[in-house]
Amino acid sequence: MLGPATFLPLTAALLLLIPGGRAQFPRQCVTPEALRSGQCCPGLFPALTPDPADRCGASVGRGRCAPLQVDARPHGPQYPHDGVDDREQWPTRFFNNSCLCAENFSGYDCGSCKPGWVGVNCNQRVLAVRRNILDLTAQERRRFIAALDLAKRTTHPHYVIASRRYAEIMGPDGNSTQFENVSIYNFFVWTHYYSIGKTFLGAGRESFGGIDFSHEGPAFVTWHRYHLLQLERDMQEMLQDPTFALPYWNFAIGGNECDICTDDFMGARSNFDSILLSSNSVFSQWRVLCESLEGYDTLGTICNSTEGGPIRRNPGGNVARPMVQRLPEPQDVALCLEVGLFDTPPFYSNSSESFRNTVEGYSEPSGKYDPSVRSLHNLAHLFLNGTGGQTHVSPNDPIFVLLHTFTDAVFDEWLRRHNADISLYPLENAPIGHNRQYNMVPFWPPVSNNEMFVTAPESLGYSYEVQWPSRALNFTEIITIAVVAALVLVAVIFAAASCAVHRSRKDDVHQPLLGEQYPRYSEEYERDASQSAV
């Protein structure tokens, strides 16, 4: 989380935290010359090298310009239009060379450090700790909300977004590239939108919607993990605080109340319109990016930096779907964590006994696929019933950040509990974009799914503080325990009865041979102690 108020100013060395990968592209790479060359290998002159011809920090041993590696293995049958979409074999439609960084160096120009490392030589460890937003102090909470709002209003210092497909990227005159500035938070929104958009098949043809590079497949957890890491690192740089961490919302609390939908947290309901946010929350002033999905799909345009209407939210208010009027239960998380397989064929939203499909929310918490079920991540989104419940615009509601941070915490805990290794992730035949070695769309420089299939504290520079629920007993287990308890009780009663019978028999054996009317030896001795005891 944000460091305490007494946090010392960072040295210039610690400020080398330029994020390691982003989308769309760095400003240096969107000139007509760079796009025509297919190379995006900016240099570090004059910041870190005196060589004006430097590329990727090669002159100081930080990296080199190298051909891109892309996944060419077969994808699943869900997408039949190979060769049409700009996002296929990402990012080769735009570039075929990028910076390949050495050791702990990272970034589009190798000028920054890998997650978890800081310093001029990227040799100092740092760990950001993600905590429950309800556990933050009032000061920490206010600083986090203020930081989000600042990110919404601050132009991204490094990256720009495309406003046209590749076929139109050079502009009407063939020499005016179609990219726009965007704020840090809206950049986060735009990358999510770009990953889920339909495939444009041409004017007058219906766009193809059976494609999603960040949902309904194995990459759901890896893509969103990097998506969050991107925002966190952007905000660390903005705040000049390498310990800044995104908090999480534990949405698995059951019931029909949103415990963070208050003005102290993420915004209460407006007193004047129940689907808008209270004017006492800064988030009521936020405007939504990428709303006009229909226009994008039919005209082949791409969402640009233009904002639209306000955030809408009506938690638990979808009366037409009672099943999404309640949040997931704590036991849903416990059950999900016990699902042993990461993913199962067809590696899609109808996979059964798949941890990924379970945490995404297309299966029952136990892992069994049921087309009528929406659970965990999906249920939390649908419960919000507004901007946060619509996939293409959901990141506009800042609750998205907290919801997905908790989802990532579940993923990280599953990796730890199951000692998961990359062999569990499908190498091929997953939906397009979801194979193990596919470069996640639209991050730059390229980041593959397998790079995010690791435990976070050891590899990604952050950890979680979470108390995980224990799993409740199911009906069969309760019956089994009851039967065993009954058998134990019967055994105890039988043992007690046996002991009583045994004691009774033992007492019979030791009954005196003489009755009470006969004097005992001791009595005779006591009456005449002078007589012989023989």
From Swiss-Prot:
Gene3D superfamilies: Di-copper center containing domain from catechol oxidase (1.10.1280.10). Zn(2+) A binds at residues 192, 215, 224. The chain crosses the membrane at residues 478-501. It comes from the Eukaryota. PROSITE patterns: TYROSINASE_1 (PS00497), TYROSINASE_2 (PS00498). The keyword Membrane applies. Residues 502-534 are cytoplasmic. Keywords: Copper, Disulfide bond, Glycoprotein, Melanin biosynthesis, Membrane, Metal-binding, Monooxygenase, Oxidoreductase, Signal, Transmembrane, Transmembrane helix, Zinc. Residues 1-23 form the signal peptide. The gene is TYRP1. Glycans are attached at residues 96, 104, 175, 181, 304, 350, 385. Disulfide bonds join 29-40, 41-65, 56-99, 101-110, 113-122, 258-261, 290-303. This is 5,6-dihydroxyindole-2-carboxylic acid oxidase. Residues 24-477 are lumenal, melanosome. Pathway: Pigment biosynthesis; melanin biosynthesis. Plays a role in melanin biosynthesis. Catalyzes the oxidation of 5,6-dihydroxyindole-2-carboxylic acid (DHICA) into indole-5,6-quinone-2-carboxylic acid. May regulate or influence the type of melanin synthesized. Also to a lower extent, capable of hydroxylating tyrosine and producing melanin. Zn(2+) B binds at residues 377, 381, 404. One of its GO terms (biological process) is melanosome organization. It is a single-pass type I membrane protein. It holds the Pfam family Tyrosinase. Its cofactor is Cu(2+); Zn(2+). InterPro entries: Di-copper_centre_dom_sf (IPR008922), LE_dom (IPR002049), Tyrosinase/Hemocyanin (IPR050316), Tyrosinase_Cu-bd (IPR002227). It is an enzyme of class 1 (oxidoreductase).
